[in-house]
Amino acid sequence: MTARGNLFIVSAPSGAGKSSLISALLKDKPADMQVSVSHTTRAPRPGEVNGQHYHFVNVEEFKALIEQNAFFEWAEVFGNYYGTSRHVIEHTLTQGIDVFLDIDWQGAQQVKAVMPEAIGVFILPPSRDELERRLTGRGQDSQEVIASRMAQAVSEMSHYKEYDFIIVNDDFDTALADLRAIIRSQRLTGASQIHAQNDMLNDLLAG
């Protein structure tokens, strides 16, 4: 019997390395885990592909999907809308595939309200100075935007207590190992093993 997949919520302030960690985790395209592809109204960045990185839609289309209750969660972030397809998530989990939601604390609260068993992971930078250095090093944003993101980061980081696990991304390889350890631990819980090893357990206990 295939165990139902786990839903992992991964959140972090911009620049903490969340997207890089998820990308490294899924680099070899494992069959038993995938990241959810969100809908968004923001413009594509260079190199982003529609349907692979995001489903890019306009505001009118996004609001229509809200009315249809199509989203597992949705939020407005930095003036843009982001949402996660309810149908896609449920279908993927029933196939025994772990799903990663790359969302902020607002979306995390919505998901937890609907699916309390979802596992929350919050990624923190080692310091504010390091976070600002990473944001500046991207070379993508103006100083005004960086200042805005730093201010927003303080608000976002105040929600770390709402998550089940906390990873400090000081050393990338260590943080990645921590994330993998969390995933492994969730696959070994009693509930997961009962589903995955049902036939074996029945044979072991057969009188």
Swiss-Prot record:
<keyword id="KW-0067">ATP-binding</keyword>
<protein>
    <recommendedName>
        <fullName>Guanylate kinase</fullName>
        <ecNumber>2.7.4.8</ecNumber>
    </recommendedName>
</protein>
<dbReference type="Pfam" id="PF00625">
    <property type="entry name" value="Guanylate_kin"/>
</dbReference>
<dbReference type="InterPro" id="IPR008144">
    <property type="entry name" value="Guanylate_kin-like_dom"/>
</dbReference>
<dbReference type="GO" id="GO:0005829">
    <property type="term" value="C:cytosol"/>
</dbReference>
<keyword id="KW-0808">Transferase</keyword>
<comment type="similarity">
    <text>Belongs to the guanylate kinase family.</text>
</comment>
<dbReference type="InterPro" id="IPR020590">
    <property type="entry name" value="Guanylate_kinase_CS"/>
</dbReference>
<keyword id="KW-0547">Nucleotide-binding</keyword>
<keyword id="KW-0418">Kinase</keyword>
<comment type="function">
    <text>Essential for recycling GMP and indirectly, cGMP.</text>
</comment>
<feature type="binding site">
    <location>
        <begin position="12"/>
        <end position="19"/>
    </location>
    <ligand>
        <name>ATP</name>
    </ligand>
</feature>
<dbReference type="InterPro" id="IPR017665">
    <property type="entry name" value="Guanylate_kinase"/>
</dbReference>
<dbReference type="InterPro" id="IPR027417">
    <property type="entry name" value="P-loop_NTPase"/>
</dbReference>
<dbReference type="GO" id="GO:0004385">
    <property type="term" value="F:guanylate kinase activity"/>
</dbReference>
<dbReference type="InterPro" id="IPR008145">
    <property type="entry name" value="GK/Ca_channel_bsu"/>
</dbReference>
<keyword id="KW-0963">Cytoplasm</keyword>
<dbReference type="GO" id="GO:0005524">
    <property type="term" value="F:ATP binding"/>
</dbReference>
<feature type="domain" description="Guanylate kinase-like">
    <location>
        <begin position="5"/>
        <end position="184"/>
    </location>
</feature>
